[in-house]
């Protein structure tokens, strides 16, 4: 997995930061998922090396404009490109479907590919999986914000152990399609009648990696619980610690709240994003100051910037 930040500002864009959007690359399946889609996100795609044609799923955290105003245009452009035959699944708060229908219908926009909207609320309230396939699961939880908001956690299922090709050769197993079967742990009958158990040629299972997107919210226990042991936590950090009172009023997080969540949850790495546009160069407090505040509590913290890409790596706490 690899994440690419397409927008890291809160509320409004700045010259250096667009509003919220995070792309999750899944190279093993030539697929990409998007978390939030603020205004201008499709322009950010054009400035990156991401391929919009690989977009398969979109997860919306909440319905504030800086997280959704780019979605109708992006979906329309995807339709015009004719490169989305498999369709797109969207997940988000209850009003997401009516928002999209209103924008697309009133603009006479035709989406020429399958588009399905799923509500996140039932899975968040019941603690069930929002999505699952052979390789990945997605869970979500309600956050504490002025409107219904959800954090999303993506977990990769355990990976098969590494295939011992030298051992296979020593047993006289000829290379070819049979190797793929053995790598999957299947039993294979060779031409000479021998039956080879693939599990004897594979090492132990390897843990998959995990990433969680947590925005918008003030510090809350639900976020800590969902984040436990996650490899990469992407957490909003709208305000500096000195403005904690404002953060509580607006139900946003400070840099120290994000770090506290990471520390209590035992995550591998923290990336802070969704910074207030007030923290621009020349102001008394800069984004680097927010980074230092977070690192004082959780040292393995990075400051997200537009077009920053991070490989999701397993941490020792990964569950």
Curated annotation (Swiss-Prot):
GO molecular function term, any single one: 3'-tRNA processing endoribonuclease activity
EC nos: 3.1.26.11
Quaternary data: Homodimer.
NCBIfam families in the cross-refs: PRK00055.1-3, RNase_Z
Source organism: Parasynechococcus marenigrum (strain WH8102)
Gene coding for it: rnz
Cofactor(s) required for function per UniProt: Zn(2+)
Cofactor note: Binds 2 Zn(2+) ions.
Residues engaged in binding Zn(2+) 2: 66-67, 216, 274
Alphabetized PANTHER family for the sequence: ZINC PHOSPHODIESTERASE ELAC PROTEIN 1 (PTHR46018:SF2)
Record keyword Zinc present: yes
Keywords: Endonuclease, Hydrolase, Metal-binding, Nuclease, tRNA processing, Zinc
Known function: Zinc phosphodiesterase, which displays some tRNA 3'-processing endonuclease activity. Probably involved in tRNA maturation, by removing a 3'-trailer from precursor tRNA.
Catalytic-site annotation from UniProt: 66 (proton acceptor)
Name used for this protein in its record: Ribonuclease Z
Catalytic activity, reaction form: Endonucleolytic cleavage of RNA, removing extra 3' nucleotides from tRNA precursor, generating 3' termini of tRNAs. A 3'-hydroxy group is left at the tRNA terminus and a 5'-phosphoryl group is left at the trailer molecule
Family: Belongs to the RNase Z family.
Pfam families the UniProt entry points to: Lactamase_B_2
Gene3D superfamilies reported for this sequence: Ribonuclease Z/Hydroxyacylglutathione hydrolase-like
Binding site for Zn(2+) 1: 62, 64, 145, 216
């Amino acid at each position: 997995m690899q994440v690419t930040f397409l927008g890291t500002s809160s509320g409004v864009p700045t010259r250096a930061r667009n509003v919220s959007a995070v792309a999750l690359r899944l190279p093993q399946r030539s697929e990409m998922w998007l978390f939030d889609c603020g205004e201008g996100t499709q322009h950010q795609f054009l400035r990156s090396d991401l391929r919009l044609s690989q977009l398969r799923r979109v997860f919306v955290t909440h319905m504030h404009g800086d997280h959704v105003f780019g979605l109708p245009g992006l979906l329309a452009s995807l339709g015009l490109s004719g490169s989305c035959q498999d369709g797109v699944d969207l997940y988000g708060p209850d009003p997401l479907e009516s928002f999209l229908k209103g924008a697309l219908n009133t603009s006479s926009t035709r989406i020429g590919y399958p588009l399905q909207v799923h509500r996140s609320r039932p899975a968040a309230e019941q603690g069930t999986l929002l999505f699952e396939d052979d390789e990945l699961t997605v869970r979500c939880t309600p956050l504490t914000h002025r409107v219904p908001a959800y954090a999303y956690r993506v977990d990769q299922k355990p990976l098969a152990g590494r295939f011992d090709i030298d051992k296979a050769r020593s047993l006289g197993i000829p290379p070819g399609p049979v190797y793929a079967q053995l790598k999957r742990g299947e039993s294979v009958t060779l031409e000479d009648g021998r039956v080879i158990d693939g599990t004897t040629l594979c090492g132990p299972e390897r843990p998959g990696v995990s990433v969680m997107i947590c925005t918008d919210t003030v510090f809350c226990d639900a976020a800590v619980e969902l984040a436990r042991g996650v490899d990469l936590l992407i957490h909003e950090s709208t305000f500096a610690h000195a403005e904690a009172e404002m953060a509580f009023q607006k139900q946003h997080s400070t840099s120290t709240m994000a770090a506290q969540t990471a520390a209590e949850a035992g995550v591998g790495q923290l990336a802070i994003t969704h910074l207030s546009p007030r923290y621009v160069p020349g102001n008394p407090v800069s984004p680097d100051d927010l980074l230092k505040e977070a690192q004082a509590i959780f040292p393995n913290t990075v400051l997200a910037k537009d077009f920053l890409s991070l490989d999701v790596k397993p941490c020792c706490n990964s569950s």
